[in-house]
């Protein structure tokens, strides 16, 4: 570069014996450089001149002396920091203001440290332990009770009930039948294996049956219609000499008048009203 070329690219003033700044292979006097190229400080809104330290974070700029925590005002130069809603905070202020608190010890969970989340609450990893054995649960399966969280082995040892059918632990829900506990998915009809969880059912010798299977296997049959007589819905029936009828089927075999609550005659296992049965050789 010759002496003739040693001038400010912007104002053309000679730079001989003066401070200057080289930018993109061009020379600028300090005054022109600061006026044209300086960034403006986010804090004080003044230009960051060439003789000042320019600190940059996410395309925002600060003087070195302005780069401070917005809460405690301590310098953040060469120190770790975090941003919250575009505010710069030192790690201590960020932790106090923004970090989660441990559900167990109530202390701050520091940024960058591992935390456990369960049912909307947070724990230090070392605080998230089984209520019984005090061992860290981590990401292992757990069962929660009002008294705390338990690892599966401790829960089974201390609290578990066992299914009467599969003999495995019932961890939630379940059905009680004949003083025994069952998984919902194990409570099935002893005949057809139909799920009885949301169904009406009947029992025989402490075994559950759906209504259809019970009626087919055990229910008495109506002499008149041959259909099962089930007491599940409170249906009324008539019993006479080891024979049963639905109330609506207990009618005269000749004129079909209802015989419920009335006198009747029988002949060859048929029933008749007294009028129709008169003159017949009845069984009674």
Curated annotation (Swiss-Prot):
Q: Which Pfam families match?
A: LIM, LIM_FHL2-3_N
Q: Which UniProt keywords apply?
A: LIM domain, Metal-binding, Nucleus, Repeat, Zinc, Zinc-finger
Q: Name one GO biological process term.
A: positive regulation of transcription by RNA polymerase II
> Is tRNA-binding tagged as a keyword?
no
Q: Report the residue ranges that make up the LIM zinc-binding domain in this protein.
A: 39-100, 101-160, 161-220, 223-283
Q: Do you know which PROSITE patterns this protein is assigned to?
A: LIM_DOMAIN_1, LIM_DOMAIN_2
Q: Where are the zinc fingers (C4-type)?
A: 8-32
The protein depicted here goes by the name Four and a half LIM domains protein 5
Q: Does the keyword Repeat apply?
A: yes
Q: What is its main location?
A: nucleus
Instruction: Tell where it localizes.
Output: Nucleus
Q: What does this protein do?
A: May be involved in the regulation of spermatogenesis. Stimulates CREM transcriptional activity in a phosphorylation-independent manner.
Q: How does it assemble?
A: Interacts with CREM (via the third LIM domain). Interacts (via second LIM domain) with SPAG8.
Q: Which GO terms describe its molecular function?
A: transcription coactivator activity; zinc ion binding
Q: What's in the GO CC field?
A: nucleus; Z disc
């Amino acid at each position: 570069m010759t002496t003739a070329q040693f001038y400010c690219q912007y104002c053309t003033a000679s730079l001989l014996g003066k401070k200057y700044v080289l930018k993109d292979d061009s020379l600028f006097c300090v005054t022109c450089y600061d006026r044209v190229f300086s960034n403006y400080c986010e804090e004080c809104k003044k230009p960051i001149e060439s003789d000042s330290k320019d600190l940059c974070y996410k395309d925002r700029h600060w003087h070195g002396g302005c780069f401070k925590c917005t809460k405690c005002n301590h310098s953040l130069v060469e120190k770790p920091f975090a941003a919250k809603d575009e505010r710069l905070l030192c790690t201590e202020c960020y932790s106090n203001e923004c970090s989660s608190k441990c559900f167990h010890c109530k202390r701050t969970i520091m940024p960058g440290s591992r935390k456990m989340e369960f049912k909307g609450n947070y724990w230090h990893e070392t605080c998230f332990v089984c209520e019984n054995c005090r061992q860290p649960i981590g990401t292992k399966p757990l069962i929660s009770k009002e008294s705390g969280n338990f690892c599966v082995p401790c829960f089974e040892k201390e609290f578990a009930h066992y299914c009467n059918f599969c003999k495995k632990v019932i961890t939630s829900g379940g059905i009680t039948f004949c003083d025994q506990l069952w998984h919902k998915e194990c409570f099935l009809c002893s005949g057809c294996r139909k799920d009885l969880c949301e169904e009406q059912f009947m029992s025989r010798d402490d075994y559950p049956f759906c209504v259809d299977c019970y009626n087919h296997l055990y229910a008495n049959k109506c002499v008149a219609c041959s259909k099962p007589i089930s007491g599940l819905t409170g249906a009324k029936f008539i019993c006479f000499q080891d024979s049963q009828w639905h109330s609506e089927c207990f009618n005269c075999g000749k004129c079909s008048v209802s015989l419920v609550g009335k006198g009747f005659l029988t002949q060859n296992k048929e029933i008749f009203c007294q009028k129709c049965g008169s003159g017949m050789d009845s069984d009674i």
